Amino acid sequence: MIQKTISETSPPPMFSDEEILTEDEIEEYLDNLKSKLPSFVIILLKNNLRGKRVTKKQLDKIVERITEVLSKGRRDDKTEELNKKLQTLEQKLDAIMKLTTMAVSTKTSEEIEKIKTNEKIEIENAPIKIKSEEKPEKPVEIEVSKKKETMDTGKKTETEEKVKEIEVPKPVEKTHEKVEETKTKGEIKKEVKKEVKLKKYELPKESPMGGSFMTPIEEEKEYRLNDIPEDAVSMTLVFKWLEFLISRGGMTYLPDILDYYNKIGWISNRVILKLLRFAKNMKITFDEEELRPRDKLSPSDHIVSLLYIEKLAGRPIDSEILEMLEIEIRRIKKWAIELQSI
C-alpha cells in the first residue's frame, strides 16, 4: 500500500533529451513550429520522420539546420537573377542564329527570281526590234518594182510623182514612231512617277491657323526599311519580329517603340502602319514576372530588332557581327560566374 501511494503521489516522469520520441510527440513538436517555419516544410518533415527513431536533440538540430538554410536562401536571390539573365542572353543568341540560317536560305531564292526577271525583259525587248527593222523595207521594194514595169515613155511625169509618194510610205513612219514610243515609254513613266510622288508629299507653307509646318517630307529621308515585301519568307520574319517586340514591350508600348525607330531613321511611316495592322489580332501571355512588358527596351533588344530590319530590307548580315555578339555574351557569362564565386 505504501508503494502504491508513493507511486500515485509522485509526479509523472519527464522525458529526457536522449529518449526516443513517439510519432504523436513528433507531430506535436512540429505543430508548435508553425509560426517559425512554413507549412510545406513541416509537412515534409512529418513525412520523412515517420517510422524513424529520433530524440529531441536530433530534432532540435534538424530544425536549426532548416532555419539556417532558409536564411541563406534570401542571400542567394542575386545568384538566381544572374542565372535568369544568362538564360535570356542564350535565347537571344538562338534567335540571331535562326536569322542567319534564314538569310542563307533566302539568298538562293532571290538569285533565281533575278534570273527570271532578266529573261522576261530580254523576251519582251526582242520582238520590238524585229518589227522595226523588217516592216518598212518590204512594201517599198514591191510597190516600186510593180510601177517600174507599168511605166510608159509618154507618162514619165505621173510615174515620177507616184514613185515620190511611194518612197516615203506612211507605214514606215508609224513603225518608227512605235519604236521611238516604246523606247521613250520607260523614260516618260519614270518622269511622271517622280512628279506624282512630289505632288503627293508636298505640304502647305502655312497652316490654316496662321502657323507654318516644320515637319520634313518623308521622301527626303532615307530609311533602312522603306516598305515590307509581301513574299512568304519576309512575312514570317515580320510576325517573328512582332512576337519579339510584344513579348518585350506589350501591345501598349508597341507604337512608342516603332515611333522611336522612325525617329532614328530605321523604318518609314508606311512600315509602321503595316506592322500595327498585323499586330491587331496577336496575343501573347506572360507567365513569369520578369517577362512582363516594359516601356523601354534594352540595347541588346534593339540590336535584335536591327537585325530583323536589315534582313527584311534584303541586306545580308555579316558573320563578323554575330561573332562579336557571341564574344560579348561570353564575357558577361564569365563576369557572372566570378560574382557567384565571391
Curated annotation (Swiss-Prot):
Its Gene Ontology biological processes? archaeal or bacterial-type flagellum-dependent cell motility
Q: Where in the cell is it found?
A: Archaeal flagellum
* UniProtKB keywords: Archaeal flagellum
Q: Where is this chain primarily localised?
A: other
**Family matches, as InterPro entries:** Arch_fla_DE (IPR006752), FlaD_prd_arc (IPR016682), Flagella_assembly_related (IPR052494)
> Using the chain's own numbering, where are the disulfide bonds?
none
Q: Which GO terms describe its cellular component?
A: archaeal-type flagellum
Q: Please verify whether the record's keywords include Magnesium.
A: no
Family membership: To M.voltae FlaD, also to FlaE.
Name the PANTHER family for this protein: FLAGELLA-RELATED PROTEIN D-RELATED, FLAGELLA-RELATED PROTEIN E-RELATED-RELATED
Q: What name appears for this protein in its UniProt entry? A: Putative flagella-related protein D
